[in-house]
Regions:
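Feature recognizes metal-dependent phosphohydrolase scaffolds
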Residues: 1-172
């Protein structure tokens, strides 16, 4: 824990959270740390997190965050129930095996966990060590008809979207 509030970047906030893929700033009050790196230019669904400090000697709890991304907005046309992720891939454990390909989407198996899931084909990359996935989750976000969501990518199996900084799937 730091004596004074420390603001950190460089390490995208989505990497601090194991089971979700969220780009929002993290206020770790118990450690006196605010992490603001939204993954710009590095992460799928990235956003700019700008820390707003209302006055010179403001307490950490008085600060807020404004976010920005340039993904297109969409008004949700239907309700969707939340389905918790069975996997949330991060770059440091992202090797996959392709099991099936369908147009713009692939069914893969995460090598270290054995979990099988669908993801956009465009999220895969290869190198001499194998086939790897970009950061992805199989979470289906809770979305209500009329919610404003951001469209990250459209696929034949649904859309990767962002709602309130959280990435996941939505079926229109």
């Amino acid at each position: 824990k730091y004596d004074k509030c420390v603001v950190v970047g460089h390490w995208p906030v989505c990497l601090y959270q194991k089971d979700i893929n969220c780009m929002n700033a993290i206020f770790a009050v118990d450690k006196n740390v605010i992490a603001i790196d939204g993954g710009c230019a590095l992460k799928i669904g990235a956003q700019l997190n700008a820390l707003v400090i209302p006055q010179k000697n403001a307490l950490m709890q008085e600060c807020s965050v404004e976010t920005y991304d340039d993904f297109p907005s969409l008004v949700a046309s239907r309700n969707q129930e939340y389905q918790k992720a069975t996997i949330s891939i991060k770059y440091f454990d992202s090797e996959v095996k392709v099991l099936e390909e369908q147009d713009d989407i692939v069914f893969v198996q995460h090598v270290s966990s054995g979990v099988k899931f669908w993801e956009p084909q465009s999220y895969l990359y290869k190198n001499s060590n194998g086939v790897f996935s970009g950061d992805i989750t199989d979470t289906w976000l809770e979305i209500h008809k009329g919610d404003i969501i951001k469209v990250i990518e459209r696929t034949s199996k649904g859309m990767i979207v962002k709602k309130d900084g959280m990435l996941g799937w939505y079926q229109e």
